[in-house]
């Protein structure tokens, strides 16, 4: 049986993660909405930790804005690109590390902690809770912590309408329709309430849960799909007006759970 590290590295070694947030409208929307929420809470000069920084899209952007950024990435190929993209830059440091073990950082070190990918790939409850607890631990009191996660329904809508519905249902749901999380699962999705319940009893105050890319990934392959460049900014603003509506959250692929450390 492959390890989590082997599964994740195998995927990202062949995926073009560096352009993911640029090459499609749903990626561009996800980036714009996530940055909107970051900017809602960040303050000039904040110390920011990004866990699961990928190739550095968010970390590098925030460092350019003058934030003191620490980027942690598990996959070596992603980390190599992050370091190449940030070479010679001020305000950014990068390390290889795992979201489930941040023992290299002291308690209450960062003003804002971003976990924008690791929870896509953690399937065992112990590891999920350890990653959440570690992110909260290293964040200062009253600091902001953001966790990206995937909707299991968004996964179904975006990936299993190509004659493979039965395979998707078996992959993601038990026979009585409970969401499945299991070893060797590359991407794990959640029911919205199920994800929010992970934080019960933890020293945080929930602020909001927001969708970051809506149904765009599910419809972008349509032959008639088009959002012209001149309309994109207005589209983002329109989406942001509804990004926290509970009745829409399940259909989005990517979501953001925003909380404050108590």
Where do the protein language model's features map onto the residues?
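Conserved class I S-adenosyl-L-methionine
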Residues: 1-52, 57, 61, 144-173
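A short acidic, Gly/Pro-enriched loop at the edge of an enzyme's catalytic core
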Residues: 103-113
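A short glycine-rich, Lys/Arg-flanked "PGG" loop and its adjoining helix->strand segment in the class I
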Residues: 129-141
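Short alpha-helix
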Residues: 186-203, 209
């Amino acid at each position: 049986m492959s390890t989590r590290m082997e599964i994740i590295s195998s995927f990202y070694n062949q995926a073009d993660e560096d352009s993911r947030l640029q090459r499609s409208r749903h990626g561009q929307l996800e980036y714009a909405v996530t940055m909107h929420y970051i900017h809602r809470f960040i303050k000039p000069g904040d110390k920011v930790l990004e866990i699961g920084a990928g190739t550095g899209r968010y970390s590098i952007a925030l460092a350019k804005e003058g934030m003191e950024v620490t980027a942690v990435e598990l996959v070596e190929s992603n980390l190599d690109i992050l370091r190449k993209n940030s070479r010679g830059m001020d305000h950014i440091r990068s390390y290889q590390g795992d979201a489930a073990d941040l023992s290299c950082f002291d308690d209450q070190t960062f003003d804002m902690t971003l976990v924008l990918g690791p929870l896509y790939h953690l399937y065992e409850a112990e590891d999920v809770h350890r990653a959440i607890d570690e992110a909260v631990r290293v964040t200062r009191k009253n600091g902001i912590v953001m966790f990206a996660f995937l909707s299991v329904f968004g996964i179904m809508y975006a990936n299993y309408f190509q004659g493979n519905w039965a395979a998707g249902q078996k992959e993601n749901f038990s026979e009585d329709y409970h969401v499945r999380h299991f070893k060797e699962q590359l991407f794990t999705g959640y029911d919205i309430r199920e994800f929010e319940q992970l934080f019960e009893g933890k020293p945080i105050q929930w602020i909001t849960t927001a969708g970051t890319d809506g149904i765009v990934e599910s419809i972008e392959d349509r032959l008639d799909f088009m959002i012209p460049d001149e309309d994109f900014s207005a589209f983002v603003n329109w989406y942001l007006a509804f990004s926290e509506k509970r009745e829409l959250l399940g259909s989005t692929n990517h979501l953001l759970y925003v909380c404050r450390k108590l």
